[in-house]
Amino acid sequence: MNALSGVATLNTAASSRVVQLSDTHLMCEPGGQLLGVDTDRSLAAVCRLVAAHGPIDALLLTGDLAGDEAEDAYGRLGEALVSLGAPSFWLPGNHDAIWSDDHPLKWHFKRTVRLPHWDILMLNTQHPGAVAGYLADSEIEALEQAVEHAQTTGRPLLVATHHPLMPVGCEWLDEIGAENAQAALQRLVPLSERAV
């Protein structure tokens, strides 16, 4: 089963406000902690901060949504995000479960988010049984198709992953980046302007 599928088309204004969140690590029970932090309270504080900056058009949640693959955590996550009034699109991280295609929250896991003037490609770097990331052949193929679409249409492309594709200057995070990131980065070379 593929974790990501489909296209979500958002008809927003000429400019789009997209917020990216990662590593919410919600636990099975409300009030669960990770490294001494109540992750539900942390998410609530982040949502208040996002709301204070005005309306947004979309949320990208880029992995480690749950801290222990607990299904209840995903339901609470969806409920917490409702207050922001924007659709949210999710990527799995190394701490997340992947569901069957008929799971009620599966609609959050889209391959592509299409905004009026640019596209967002969601790539799954989850490598079951490992902490470090890895891009399966299907993810590399999706990237190739998205790059070809960007070249054909001239639409800018943003690529979202959980595991970094390049070193970010944080030793422990750099150690768990996508193992085959170079394969992805090579596919991005044809795009003349890019930021990674």
Give short role names for the model-derived ranges.
Residues P30, L61-V82, A97-F109, G133, ...:
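Metal-dependent catalytic neighborhoods of phosphoester/phosphodiester hydrolases
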Residues E71-P87, E175-L188:
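Short, electropositive alpha-helical surface patch
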Residues S88-W99:
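A short, structured active-site edge motif that brings together acidic residues
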Residues G32, G154-V196:
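Active-site-proximal segments of metal-dependent phosphoesterases and phosphodiesterases across multiple
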Residues S15-C28, H117-H127, L158-H162:
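Active-site-proximal beta-strand elements of phosphoester/diester hydrolases
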Residues D23, L59, D64, L77, ...:
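Divalent metal-coordination and catalytic microenvironments
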Residues M1-R76:
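N-terminal active-site segment of His-dependent metallophosphoesterases
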Residues N2-V7, A44-V46, D101-R111, L143:
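Alpha-helical scaffolding within the catalytic cores
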